[in-house]
Amino acid sequence: MRARLLALAQARGEDFSLLLNRYGTERLLHRLSLSPLRERFVLKGALLFDLWFAAPHRPTRDADLLGFGPADAEALALAVRSLCIIEADDGMVYDPASLRIEAIRAEANYGGLRATLGGTLGRARCAVQLDVGFGDVVTPAATETELPPLLSGIAATRLRVYPRETVVAEKLDAMVVLALGNSRMKDYYDLDALRREGRIDRDLLAAAIAATFARRGTPLPTGLPLGLTEEFVTDSVKRAQWSAFVGKNRLQAAELDRVVHDLAEWLAPVLEQARRLAAARDP
């Protein structure tokens, strides 16, 4: 398996250690799909973009999950340890003794728990990180989806996953909350990819935005959020952060001003529709 993964990294021109970490994460998620615990989690985050798009989207070191129930560190530790002992024919071995759980505080108005642990594929070591949030609403409902494996010939993973609409809604919420302090350039890159894909239903997106903002207690902006305005794109720090993000991840991307302009044009009417939904719900 290690040799096959190394060949894949070379063929893609990717860093082997990053791909190994990705493989370790993928196979731990596969063990989750074999466990009764699968009903307690929904997959979200950057891994979904590799499901939705044919070409690799952007490098990611972790998996993001929505967990149901209380944000209890000991319960999460027990859950992850139980996954480590599930056998699968993929070469991965996980070390339950290396597991660490810590509270994470996101930049925006919500947090969660982070689980990190080590694993081995043959003699190669990898690091696995799961970031688990709690309490969010998923609109429309999560659907069970097959996640194709990195390597052919090994079992695929079936898990419930976020819809595109809630992915957009949560990133927009962070954009509103953080305003000019937003350093999450990956969100702009992800949103632009979803905009260009053109598969998001406008009515569902408006409903997801209204529901997400209500659940997180974030007031819907009366106009465009600062993160979608000229003030944001002309800020020298933001432009530098965008350039650094694109360069570090070796991405092909438009300039920040073009990305923000296109996102503003796309999201402005949807935000207006979300405001009408929110007003009708709470007159």
Task: Walk through the language-model features, giving the residues of each.
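Helix-turn-helix
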Residues: L48
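Structured mid-to-C-terminal alpha-helical surface segments
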Residues: M1-F41, L51-P59, A63, G67-P283
